[in-house]
Every structure is written in C-alpha cells, then in structure tokens.
Amino acid sequence: MRADLDAFLEHLRSERQVSAHTLDGYRRDLLKILALAEKAGLSDWNALDTRSLRTFVARLHQQGQSSRSLARLLSATRGLYQYLLREGRCRHDPANGLSAPKSPRKLPRTLDADRALQLLDGAVEDDFIARRDQALLELFYSSGLRLSELVGLDLEWLDLKEGLVRVRGKGNKVRELPVGKAARQALEAWLPLRTQAAPEDGAVFIGRSGKRLTPRAIQLRVRQAGVRELGQHLHPHMLRHSFASHLLESSGDLRAVQELLGHADIATTQIYTHLDFQHLASVYDRAHPRAKRKGNADGGNDP
C-alpha cells in the first residue's frame, strides 16, 4: 500500500506539478488513512471499502479533526483512488459520495437588550462625526440592515415622515423596512449637518470630504463605538443579529423576521430561534426554583 501511495505522490509532483505545500498536505492526509488501514489489517487499497473509510473518518472526527480537515482528507483519498483506477491498481473508489461530518453551525454573536441600549444611549456631542455615527448605529439596530445596504443607502430611499427606509439587498432585491423613533430622531439630527460636507451624491452617510463612507470606514466607526461604550469590539453584523434576536424574542414571529432581514430561505432565519432558546434557557436557570436543584434523581439521602 505504501508503494502505491508513494507512486501517487510522485505523480502529483512530477506530472501534476503541485506545490510542495500541497504535496505535503496530500502526504499527511493519506498517511493517516494508510495508518488506519494497516491497523485494521488491510493489505491493499482494494480492501478498503466505503464502510471502513466512513469508520476511519468518524474516528478522526472524534479525535478532534475539524470538518474542513476531514473534507480535505477525503478529497486526497479520492485523488489517490482515481489515480489507482487509471493505473489498473484498484477496482473501486470508497471515498466516492462520502462527505465529512458537518460541524455544528456557529451561532451569531449578539448584544443583549441592555447592552444594546447602553451602546445607543450614551451622550452624543452635537458635531458632524458624532451625529453621523449615532445615526448609523441607530439605523443598524432599528432596521437590521446589512453593512452593504447601509453603505449604499441614498436619501431618496429614506422617508422619515412615514418612518420607512428602502434598501437594495442580496440578489438586487428591494425591501421596505420600518425606522424606529430613536433612529428617526438620530437621522433628523444628522441630515442637516450632512449638507456641510457638500456631498458629491445622495449617500446618506458620508465623510467630511463629502464622499460616501466605505464599508471599512463604517466597520471602524462601529468598532470604536463598541470599545468606547461597552469595552468590546463590535461589527455591524452584530447589530443586525441583535435586531433579529430581540425582535424574535419579543414577537415570536419567524416569518416577519425573515421578511425584515431579507432572507430568501426561512432556514437562514431559523438560526435566531436557537439564540432565542438560549435566552429562554438562561431565564429558566435564573428564575425557576428547581432549575439548579442539587442532588441525584432518587433524592439522595431523603427517606
């Protein structure tokens, strides 16, 4: 088996001319499979079937290998077997159709409601930068905008009288969103100052030069506000996640949250139900008299 593996690696080096880094990756991954196969008493690559390979992958996953690493390992294994099939050294590919175990989806980070209010309720100086930053923070949290949507927002899409904003989201889809009272007030305080910069176009959020703020500039302003008010780094999407989580927590209306976020598939929105459950579980742990009851199920030493 080792001779076949070495021949494949030489094929990658001399004929495919892969980089040394890529070649080392193939070697490490395939040596893991070889070690497991030899430990199982297999004497050639034909003896490795899909069931055995799945068992090997599961074992590596239990040992702490990430899904990404295992996907790369399976890709290397498929490459080996395709080579062996072409060379007539093997009759099947046990990795065909096999996929790596999926990692649990990471929950988005959010602020709890009190922290969100702490961020937004700080004292605001009456100057260009402070008023602008307050308006964009309020709008992020009030309407759940994506960073790209806030960057691309023009005055003509803002209706403060009706408390509405239109944005162009993913897939060039336009949606209309409510603007809360606090966000309206922040925008009303910002827009008169905006004209001082002689804006080049209709962008709602601009710098002192009059140019539309870039995504990077907005990320920096949000991060600085987080450090100043909360002592932590924030990202614009964290405010969007907080908007969704708090709205779902209060309303329980998943479909409405989906529409407001502009998600094409409700499955994307369902991640926030896990956040909501975490909140409910936390409330239960803090408030229920028997939530943290000590002792075993049979009552310990009770008669």
Swiss-Prot record:
Protein's GO biological process: cell division; cellular response to zinc ion; chromosome segregation; DNA recombination; DNA transposition; resolution of DNA recombination intermediates
Record-annotated Tyr recombinase domain positions: 106-285
Chief subcellular location: cytoplasm
GO cellular component: cytoplasm; Holliday junction resolvase complex
Keyword check for Cytoplasm: yes
Domain Core-binding (CB): 1-85
Positions annotated as active site in the UniProt record: R146, K170, H237, R240, H263, Y272 (o-(3'-phospho-dna)-tyrosine intermediate)
One Gene Ontology MF term: tyrosine-based site-specific recombinase activity
Gene ablation phenotype (knockout): Defects affect induction of pyoverdin and related outer membrane proteins.
Gene3D superfamilies: 1.10.150.130, Intergrase catalytic core
Key words of the record: Cell cycle, Cell division, Chromosome partition, Cytoplasm, DNA integration, DNA recombination, DNA-binding
Top-rank taxon, per record: Bacteria
Location relative to the cell: Cytoplasm
Similarity comment text for this entry: Belongs to the 'phage' integrase family. XerC subfamily.
Function statement: Site-specific tyrosine recombinase, which acts by catalyzing the cutting and rejoining of the recombining DNA molecules. The XerC-XerD complex is essential to convert dimers of the bacterial chromosome into monomers to permit their segregation at cell division. It also contributes to the segregational stability of plasmids.
Subunit record text: Forms a cyclic heterotetrameric complex composed of two molecules of XerC and two molecules of XerD.
Protein's name according to its UniProt entry: Tyrosine recombinase XerC
Lineage: Bacteria, Pseudomonadati, Pseudomonadota, Gammaproteobacteria, Pseudomonadales
Record gene name: xerC
